[in-house]
């Protein structure tokens, strides 16, 4: 199941509840074509990988959170895990951390676009 996140408080609570589990957050918008394409795949992944926490942020209704997380492309997927930080990889070759002053979860991966194979491969790798 994909949990809808509306603000930073809900995101912090999600990380707290996730404990040591991998957290995958999708930043998307209703008007975004690639977001619509990947949405059912993301939902299916949430059912397939029950030991991973999945969340979705609508950037139009959660502008402050999207800005805080430096979202510039849609869809963007950010993966977080408790305090240990793994070497990050990004198609844009940059590391963006959504939680500069939040809970102890760290972003360990970010990807952009509706590439379901890459997303699933990275989830399997980081679980």
From Swiss-Prot:
Cellular compartment(s): Cytoplasm; Golgi apparatus
Gene Ontology CC entries for this record: acrosomal vesicle; Golgi apparatus
Pfam families: Thioredoxin
Tissues expressed in: Testis-specific. Only expressed during spermiogenesis, prominently in the Golgi apparatus of pachytene spermatocytes and round and elongated spermatids, with a transient localization in the developing acrosome of round spermatids (at protein level).
Coiled coil regions in record: none
Cystine crosslinks: 32-35
Domain of life per record: Eukaryota
Keyword Nuclease applies: no
Primary localization: cytoplasm
Signal peptide positions (record): none
Stated family: Belongs to the thioredoxin family.
Name by which UniProt lists this protein: Thioredoxin domain-containing protein 8
Organism expressing this protein natively: Mus musculus (Mouse)
Highest classification ranks of the organism: Eukaryota, Metazoa, Chordata, Craniata, Vertebrata
């Amino acid at each position: 199941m994909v949990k809808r996140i509306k603000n930073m408080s809900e995101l912090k609570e999600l990380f707290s509840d996730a404990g040591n589990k991998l957290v995958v957050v999708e930043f998307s918008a209703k008007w975004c074509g690639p977001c619509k394409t990947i949405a059912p795949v993301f939902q299916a992944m949430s059912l397939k990988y029950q030991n991973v926490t999945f969340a979705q942020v609508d950037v139009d209704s959660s502008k402050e959170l999207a800005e805080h997380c430096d979202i510039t492309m849609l869809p963007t997927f950010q993966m977080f895990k408790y305090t240990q930080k793994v070497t990050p990889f990004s198609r844009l070759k940059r590391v963006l951390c959504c939680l500069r002053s939040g809970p102890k979860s760290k972003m360990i991966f970010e990807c952009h676009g509706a590439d379901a194979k890459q997303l699933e491969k990275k989830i399997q790798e980081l679980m």
